[in-house]
């Protein structure tokens, strides 16, 4: 289950090339079409915009997924648990959670009064909450961007992106770069920068205020040579960083 190129990339470096060939990807139209069309097998959900439509979608998917995708119960499930379709696809099956950004390090409490209706209508993950707190999440793969919340430490494994990437075969690395349309010239240009800031939609997700987000980035980039800084903006991040 993927919605961002970030999580997709992490999944690809965590598995072998033969596993990639046999993976069925559940995604939404948030994942760029140029990437989706290169996936070996996938289903793209067109997610509703209105709030009550989104609730109906989650209920509908939870009850129809076993009929539409019967192979799920026999599969190893990877991905994030914070997508609109996560609970309906993962259901009560074991899930290996793959980092999707800073939200994995900031657990959001779910209203306990809604546990039973959510559990009945939308599944275990919807009832328990996101970030790996559900008992169906057996393992959490994180890169260590921030300290891991105590609640999920016991089932969290920290891995190095660089080490995982270097262990891949050259042919598989080339295939991954092709999937994301990464050209050799672009990689050479990126390598000329000293620092890269990958932004996150923290304001859009209601995690912090705009002022706090900017202060966080300023702290992270303190002492950084801005002429050698590359900013990679998250697809859902609406901030124009050229103004700051």
Predicted regions located by residue number:
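Active-site and donor-binding regions of nucleotide-sugar-utilizing enzymes
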Residues: 1-134
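Signature of uroporphyrinogen-III synthase
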Residues: 210-218
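Catalytic donor nucleotide-activated moiety binding site of glycosyltransferases and closely related
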Residues: 199, 224-244
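Surface-exposed cleft-lining segments at the edges of enzyme active sites
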Residues: 199-211
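Short, catalytically relevant binding-site loops at active-site mouths
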Residues: 32-33, 37, 202-205, 236-239
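Short boundary motifs at domain starts and secondary-structure transition points
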Residues: 15-16, 67-69, 181-191, 221
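A nucleotide-sugar donor-handling region in carbohydrate enzymes
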Residues: 114-196
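A short, charged/proline- and glycine-enriched loop
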Residues: 19-20, 72-73, 186-197, 201, ...
